[in-house]
Structure formats: structure tokens, C-alpha cells
Amino acid sequence: MRVVVQRVKSSKVEVDGKIIGSIKGGLNVLLGICKGDTQKDIEYLVDKILGLRIFEDECGKMNKSLLDVKGELLVISQFTLYGDCRKGKRPSFIEALGGEEAKKLYEEFIKKCKEVLGEVQMGEFGADMLVSIENDGPVTLMIDSKKVF
């Protein structure tokens, strides 16, 4: 499982011209799920993301987490995070988990986040979405639960 975590001033996701999720400040998380991902991957990433100290403290140092600043969270499924571009010009998505299995893990990820935060904004799994992100910093991090990078 891998994520792209972005500290944002605001972020929103639209499906068919309707805003289905939006936040004013916090973290935008793009979530990719691959074959072999389990509950352990979810637990690792939720703990890591919610505890990341990437918000500034009173001295301007990145020292506070999303929980510390009472920020909001927007999670969007993104199978293309497992696009393999090493051969040819067209990405291969063979490692990405699809269908109901991936949806179940995505929903479990959201559930774990909600257990800590109470409320979580989200995209629509499998939908064609328009995502607007106003980066803050910018601060953008990639995390892989298998610690590939």
C-alpha cells in the first residue's frame, strides 16, 4: 500500500460535477492498494499519516501532526500509484489490486482513520474524479507500507 500525502490549505473532489468531499486545511491523501496488502498495511499507514509532524509549530518548525493542529483529512483512491513505467511508454498496472478486494481495503482504511479523527472526507472508489488541491508549502511525501522507498 502506498500513499502520496500533501499538506494542503484546501482540497476537494468532484464526481459528475458534484463536490463529494472537501477540506479547508489538513492532509490530502492519495491511496494506492496493491496485491498482497493486508490490515497490517492499513494500520501502519494510518498511524504514520496521522502522526506525521509536518505542520509548523509556534517557532515555524515542522513539529506538529494533523491531530495536533486538528486538521482535516481527504482520502482519494488512486490505483495509478502502482503504475510501472519502466518498460515502454504505457504504464502497466499489473501490481495494483482491483475490484471488490481493493474497495474493501479502501473502506477499511477510511474506517481506521475515522476511528481516530471522527470525520474523514473521501473520494468515490473507482469513479472518474476531478481533484483540486491547494498545496501548503508545498509539503508532499510518499510513503510505502512495504518500505520500498
Swiss-Prot record:
This protein's GO CC annotations: cytoplasm
Enzyme class: hydrolase
Subcellular localization(s) per the UniProt record: Cytoplasm
Disulfide cross-links: none
Record Pfam families: Tyr_Deacylase (PF02580)
Record keywords: Cytoplasm, Hydrolase, RNA-binding, tRNA-binding
Subcellular location, principal: cytoplasm
Entry EC number(s): 3.1.1.96
GO BP annotations, alphabetical order: D-amino acid catabolic process
The reaction(s) this protein catalyses: glycyl-tRNA(Ala) + H2O = tRNA(Ala) + glycine + H(+); a D-aminoacyl-tRNA + H2O = a tRNA + a D-alpha-amino acid + H(+)
Sequence motif: Gly-cisPro motif, important for rejection of L-amino acids, positions: 137-138
Membership in a protein family: Belongs to the DTD family.
UniProt-listed HAMAP family: Deacylase_Dtd
Subunit details: Homodimer.
NCBIfam families the record matches: D-aminoacyl-tRNA deacylase (TIGR00256)
The protein, known as: D-aminoacyl-tRNA deacylase
Species classification: Bacteria, Bacillati, Bacillota, Clostridia, Eubacteriales
Gene responsible for this protein: dtd
